[in-house]
Amino acid sequence: MAKKVANVVKLQIPAGKATPAPPVGPALGQAGINIMGFTKDFNARTADQAGMIIPVVITVYEDRSFDFITKTPPAAVLLKKAAGVESGSGEPNTKKVATVTKDQVKQIAETKMQDLNAADVEAAMRMIEGTARSMGFTVEG
């Protein structure tokens, strides 16, 4: 028989840097998860993605066991890394802060494809381009 789900926790944690300190510890403690067990597993699974923010969905069962799924980094984080900037524009329609090429957008779209609800890479590229424009980036190509 399948385990009963008690709670689902969604967090965004830097890869390889989950610690019991806030904000991770309190969120997991409230859900009744073994914090050290989760942080050890998460850090081991994301060690190769250092420097990225990794969204994670933690499913907690009634017997206090848990499973977690790591997703691809947010499109905004990937775009900022590709453009080499710290943050997007505060006024995206008037101030453009960076430029990304179609090739960079395609590469990000292919990376994000498993988490997007796009039928093909072209649709995923349009989604990523929209995110780029809303951050004040110019898409060339």
From Swiss-Prot:
Gene Ontology process terms (BP): translation
UniProt cross-references to Pfam families, sorted A to Z: Ribosomal_L11 (PF00298), Ribosomal_L11_N (PF03946)
InterPro entries recorded: Ribosomal_uL11, Ribosomal_uL11_bac-typ, Ribosomal_uL11_C, Ribosomal_uL11_C_sf, Ribosomal_uL11_CS, Ribosomal_uL11_N, Ribosomal_uL11_N_sf
Domain of life of the source: Bacteria
GO cellular component: cytosolic large ribosomal subunit
Keyword annotations from UniProtKB, A to Z: Methylation, Ribonucleoprotein, Ribosomal protein, RNA-binding, rRNA-binding
PTM: One or more lysine residues are methylated.
Gene Ontology MF, one: large ribosomal subunit rRNA binding
Family: Belongs to the universal ribosomal protein uL11 family.
Subunit structure: Part of the ribosomal stalk of the 50S ribosomal subunit. Interacts with L10 and the large rRNA to form the base of the stalk. L10 forms an elongated spine to which L12 dimers bind in a sequential fashion forming a multimeric L10(L12)X complex.
Descriptive protein name: Large ribosomal subunit protein uL11
Source species of the chain: Lactiplantibacillus plantarum (strain ATCC BAA-793 / NCIMB 8826 / WCFS1) (Lactobacillus plantarum)
